[in-house]
Amino acid sequence: MRHTYACAMRWADMDALNHVNNVAYADYLREARLAYAEEAGVRARPMTALAIDYRAPLVFRPEPVLVTTTVEDDVLVQEISDRREDGTTTVYVQARTTLADGAPPAPLRPDEALTGRLPVAGRARDLGVDGDVDQVATLELLQEARVAYATVVGARGLPWVVVRSETTFVRPLPRRATYAVHAGIGKIGRSSFEIVAQLVDDAQVFASSRNVMIGFDPEAGRARPLTDGERTQLEPHVVAG
């Protein structure tokens, strides 16, 4: 089944560049999932994993953006795009959402190699109707930690963009005044590097993420190689594996 949903945009969805914030994309995907579940007459299920590829920036406008959803067993394949009258299409996001199948999650212990420690303050609006942190809000907590960690490793303020985000939701996250995120640097490529993180509470992992960042040349509008200086800043924080 293929479902198409016209998702309204909000000014609050924008980032400092007037592009849709990465977490807002996840909100659009959720709106489309709920619309699909209602139309198909199936129960909306929580996510266990979400992988997002960011293909192009989306700027604010009053018209909605289209979200298509295709079902593959317990996986929803989704795409956020515009289709024009001349037949051309601009794809902004491609995503794969794995839905919970009812099996209890396997416990996951914190990775001691992730030596970055980032406290993130909670807010009441982070909570869902069940009293736990909403899954999209979980992405926002991880995003806050990622931005803070970029400062720790000396990458804050440099021209980077996130091109891929992988998040695993291990267990429901209870309300806390402050959440602990452990972070480190994953693979370093020619023009990219990874930030890996775990959202931890009481020696348990509640969510984990891996984000691929690329160096970006804003004048040329394309990826750029990492400089020797940037590699020198990142390499001490690389985690094994």
Protein language model regions, located:
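Preference for bulky hydrophobic residues occupying beta-strand positions
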Residues: 7-9, 27, 52, 69, ...
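HotDog/MaoC-like acyl-thioester-processing domains
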Residues: 54-64, 70-118, 173-175, 186-241
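A generic structural signal for short, non-catalytic loop/turn and secondary-structure boundary residues
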Residues: 2, 45-47, 111-113, 160, ...
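Structured core of small recognition/catalytic domains
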Residues: 131-220
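Ordered, small/hydrophobic-rich secondary-structure cores
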Residues: 1-97, 178-180
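Residues that recognize and position ribonucleotide moieties
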Residues: 18, 45, 131, 160, ...
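Catalytic strand-loop segment that frames the active site of acyl-thioester-processing enzymes
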Residues: 1-35, 39, 103-154
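Short, well-ordered turn and helix-capping elements at secondary-structure junctions
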Residues: 11, 54-58, 124-126, 165-171
